[in-house]
Swiss-Prot record:
NCBIfam families: PRK05339.1 (NF003742). Transmembrane segments: none annotated. HAMAP family: PDRP. This is Putative pyruvate, phosphate dikinase regulatory protein. It comes from the Bacteria. The keyword Kinase applies. InterPro entries: Kinase-pyrophosphorylase, PPDK_reg. GO terms for molecular function: ADP binding; ATP binding; phosphotransferase activity, phosphate group as acceptor; protein serine/threonine kinase activity. ADP binds at G153, V154, S155, R156, T157, S158, K159, T160.
Amino acid sequence: MPTSNNYFHLHLVSDSTGETLITVARAVAAQYANVTPVEHVYPLVRSQKQLDRVLDEIEEAPGIVLFTLLEKDLVSRLEDKCKGINVPSLSIIGPVMQLFEAYLGAATTGRVGAQHVLNAEYFKRIDALNYTMIHDDGQHVEGLDDADVVLVGVSRTSKTPTSIYLANRGIRTANVPLVPGIPVPVQLETLTRPLVVSLHATPERLIQVRQNRLLSMGADSSSDTYTDRQSVAEEVAFARKLSAKHDWPLLDVTRRSIEETAAAIMKLYSDRQRNRPSE
């Protein structure tokens, strides 16, 4: 149970990188706003000796234990130990694997870290990341036609983090800022191959994010047009008008996380690819 300080220990044990565990655990923990998890992440646990060290730490700071282990001996040892010290434990991939086995009629290969092998998909992600970093914030617009997705929007609409998230999914993503008074690159206006998505937010949200940004930099925002209500509203109106002119789909990111924004873009991209005539 959480302590009087409203925190609890969350142990994440993996025989690979632990990314799957972290993603699932944080998604669930976010639903409990009144308690804060203290994460203990143990990646690359592949031997009894490594697991024993993990079990010692779990015993010292009892809490919820989530794991992704494929080696049956390690799973049994972990579950037995947790049961012995009255600590809840759960395999995140176990139930999913059982479902796959029941449907496919075949057992798993049991390959640890199989999702991280250096295959074509891995190198596709690396290529996408390289492209995205080079084409961030309106840089090298001559290469925009090589993108899968181009994000546009005014300042602080999460263009860069969303671009990086998409690149991690193997989608070559560029982003271009929309600024009133500054001409849009000709290359952007003539694109036909990439999907162009316009990211938007309410003026109130943009002002809040921009003020926080300036505060973190130690700058004074009291007389800055960057956070002036009228100026920001004009920016938003300009971006909307430009997007309508070019028929770019609008995506409101006001209340969306980066992950939610990226998911919406990936759906647009998938739909577009599916409906595109074969070349």
